[in-house]
């Protein structure tokens, strides 16, 4: 790999390619911005579908980029559509795995024959876009895989093949979910229900089960793997991963680096990749509220629920008599438009704000926010920990179950709500979160993690700062 070392006077050129979902695109954009700030020429690659969605949500010039920060797109292999919804995840995973390598190689060839653009010297791709490894090896450049889940989620994925070997997956029936899992190094007191949800496959042909076995196995070929977490949060789990794949680095929380290193008003700071318009009025509303008084509710970019579950959450929140900011995506209710009961809207009129999307990192670091009702996606969990905000967790799929387990038992910052959603339980847990003794203890614990997250990203000495610099120097620049 020595051949890729960047010659003096030549700008290093990184191609960043996220998996085409909001929760993967956002952290990859942060990595791209940090590399740009360190002198890299950046090409950021979306799928055509998401490229078009971003232009619709952010305006026709939103992906014009900068002279050294360019946007490109490749097809995802699925029929062309112009919708503003998240694509079906299994279909998308299967398609990217089978169809994206050829257009990606063609894009690299085109970039490398473009005048006045430095040749591609390295690739940073999503952990589940491992087809890029074939292109990188052909080109003789390093490929760093960015696995966007928690370290505990990633370690579980690395062991998916063992679940199949042990006959634990595909599962026989729901009762299997209580099976104790005590053989993953450094992961204690787990049940099968706490393992990423794709393990719940009911047949050997299941797309997601096979996809993660395939992607986790290929991870070992990466020049390095980066994780958006920090050592003190997941120390033992990270060491267990490193015993399987030594070249693993924790470089998070990424949003703390970006907030520190990138001026929000600068050209690079202005570049965004949210597929829904962020309603900044949320922050003005929070400014009118007293500290720790508001419940923030957001189930992320993929979670869907039934109309009945939406109504139960609504009346549970109403019964707490707390102020709340609730993000309700247009596609939150499966196959329908989310409809809140008129009585609920009247009753809560003076103590709520509803939005279809919001600037979440700013919300979770706002002093008015005292608790977070979340789906336990990793970006949300990390932003909540970094803001010192405790959580009520309603995990939906993927490694959200694992994150929820760790939030509740290991990090002591969360309480889990039942999957069926009853308004009485919503009320009880949210009241405990905001006013109860357990809620106070969880807030203290969250504030401890906040301090440790800030330490990890400290200039010069922070563990994540040192790791990020090492990945840049040793791997991406090949020094």
UniProtKB/Swiss-Prot annotation:
Instruction: State the EC number(s).
Output: 2.4.1.-
Q: Where does tissue-level expression of this protein occur?
A: Expressed in roots, shoots and leaves.
GO MF, one term, reads:
glucuronosyltransferase activity
Q: Which UniProt keywords apply?
A: Glycosyltransferase, Transferase
The record's PROSITE patterns line, in alphabetical order, gives:
UDPGT (PS00375)
Which cysteines pair up through disulfides? They are none
Q: What class of enzyme is it?
A: transferase
Positions that bind UDP-alpha-D-glucose:
301, 358-360, 375-383, 397-400
**In which family does this protein belong, per the annotation?**
Belongs to the UDP-glycosyltransferase family.
**What protein name does the entry list?**
UDP-glycosyltransferase 85A5
**Source organism per UniProt:** Arabidopsis thaliana
């Amino acid at each position: 790999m020595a051949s890729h070392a960047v010659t003096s006077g030549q700008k290093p050129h990184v191609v960043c390619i996220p998996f085409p979902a909001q929760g993967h695109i956002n952290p990859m954009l942060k990595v791209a911005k940090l590399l740009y700030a360190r002198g890299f020429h950046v090409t950021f690659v979306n799928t055509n579908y998401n490229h078009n969605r971003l232009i619709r949500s952010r305006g026709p010039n939103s992906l014009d980029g900068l002279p050294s920060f360019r946007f490109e797109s490749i097809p995802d292999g699925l029929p062309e559509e112009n919708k503003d919804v998240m694509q079906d995840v299994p279909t998308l995973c299967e398609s990217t795995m089978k169809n994206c390598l050829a257009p990606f190689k063609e894009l690299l060839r085109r970039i490398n024959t473009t005048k006045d653009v430095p040749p591609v010297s390295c690739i940073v791709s999503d952990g589940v876009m491992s087809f890029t490894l074939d292109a990188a090896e052909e080109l003789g450049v390093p490929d760093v895989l960015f696995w966007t889940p928690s370290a505990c989620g990633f370690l579980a994925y690395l062991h998916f093949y063992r679940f199949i070997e042990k006959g634990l997956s595909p599962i026989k029936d729901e009762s299997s979910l209580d099976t104790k899992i005590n053989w993953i190094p450094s992961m204690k007191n787990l049940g099968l229900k706490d393992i990423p949800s794709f393990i719940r496959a009911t047949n050997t042909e299941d797309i997601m089960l096979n996809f993660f076995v395939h992607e986790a196995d290929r991870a070992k070929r990466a020049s390095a793997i980066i994780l958006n977490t920090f050592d003190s949060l997941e120390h033992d789990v990270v060491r267990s991963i490193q015993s399987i794949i030594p070249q693993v680095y924790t470089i998070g929380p990424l949003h703390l680096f970006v907030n520190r290193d990138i001026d929000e008003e600068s050209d690079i700071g202005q570049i965004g990749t949210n597929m829904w318009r962020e309603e900044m009025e949320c922050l003005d509303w929070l400014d009118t509220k007293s500290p720790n008084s508001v419940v923030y509710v957001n189930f992320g970019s993929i979670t869907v629920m039934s109309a009945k579950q939406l109504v139960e959450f609504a009346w549970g929140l109403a019964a707490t008599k707390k102020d709340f900011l609730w993000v309700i995506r247009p596609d939150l209710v499966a196959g329908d438009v989310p409809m809140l009961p008129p009585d609920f809207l009247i009753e809560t009129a003076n103590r709520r704000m509803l939005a279809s999307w919001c600037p979440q990192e700013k919300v979770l670091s706002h002093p008015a926010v005292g608790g977070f009702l979340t789906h336990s996606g990793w970006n949300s969990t990390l932003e909540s920990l970094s803001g010192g905000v405790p959580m009520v967790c309603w995990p939906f799929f993927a490694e959200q179950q694992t994150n929820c387990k760790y939030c509740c038992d290991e990090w002591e910052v969360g309480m889990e709500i039942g999957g069926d959603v009853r308004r009485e339980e919503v009320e009880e847990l949210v009241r405990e979160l905001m006013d109860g003794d357990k809620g106070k203890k969880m807030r203290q614990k969250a504030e401890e993690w906040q301090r440790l997250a800030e330490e990890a990203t400290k200039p010069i000495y922070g563990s994540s700062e040192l790791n990020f610099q090492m990945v840049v120097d040793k791997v991406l620049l090949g020094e």
